Amino acid sequence: SWPGYMPGVIDYQWNEVAIPWWKKFVQHAKQHGVEQIALEEFPSQLVYNPSTLLRLRNAVDDMIGMNLDPSHLIAMGADPIAAARKLEGAIFHVHGKDARIERGLADIDGLMEYQPVTNTKTRTWNYVAVGCGQDLKWWKEFFSVLRMTGYDGDVSLEMEDLTMSVEAGLRTSIDALNLSISR
């Protein structure tokens, strides 16, 4: 809430800009046969976590849901498994994407990272192949909780690990996802 004008700015963005715009957009989408709109939570956006997604959804329409990308929540220091539980019924899509908090760097500078993703050596967190940030036990629990909350949709692999070749990253991620997703 510092500086003092920030709460007013955020309230203005929600109440005078975002909610009215989304109400109109949802009506337009419905008129054109759209059934779901999935927003990906991402740092520095108005809708960046489960609480802000649910705020928008509750104010506008339940056709708005989350494209749950666990890597973004990990990079913000949140727990994607707890987030999945909170978002029960509001998860419309899931990304298979991992992130790693870089020990020794995040401990000093925190998680608000603005360096280019290409600076993997000095960033406090990095996108990594699935299983290279969170272990397979974590991924199995994540997918199990998704099932418990009713999610039975697709998982899109996003491989943005710049510490290995694309081929190695894809193979590592595919293997980890195959071992983690119960069929």
Residue spans for each PLM region:
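Conserved, well-structured beta-alpha core segment at the onset of a catalytic domain
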Residues: 46, 55, 75, 163, ...
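Active-site acidic/histidine proton-transfer and metal-coordination neighborhood
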Residues: 1-65
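Active-site beta-loop-alpha junctions enriched in small/polar residues
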Residues: 2-4, 40-44, 69-73, 97-101, ...
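C-terminal helical cap(s) of enzyme catalytic domains, especially alpha/beta-barrels
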Residues: 166-183
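Hydrophobic faces of well-ordered beta-strands that scaffold small-molecule active sites
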Residues: 37-39, 64-68, 92-96, 153-157
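A short, mixed-charge helix-start or loop-turn motif at secondary-structure junctions
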Residues: 7-11, 124-125, 159
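Gly/Pro-rich active-site loop or hairpin
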Residues: 15, 50-54, 73-151, 167-168
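A generic secondary-structure signal
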Residues: 28, 55-56, 145, 176-179
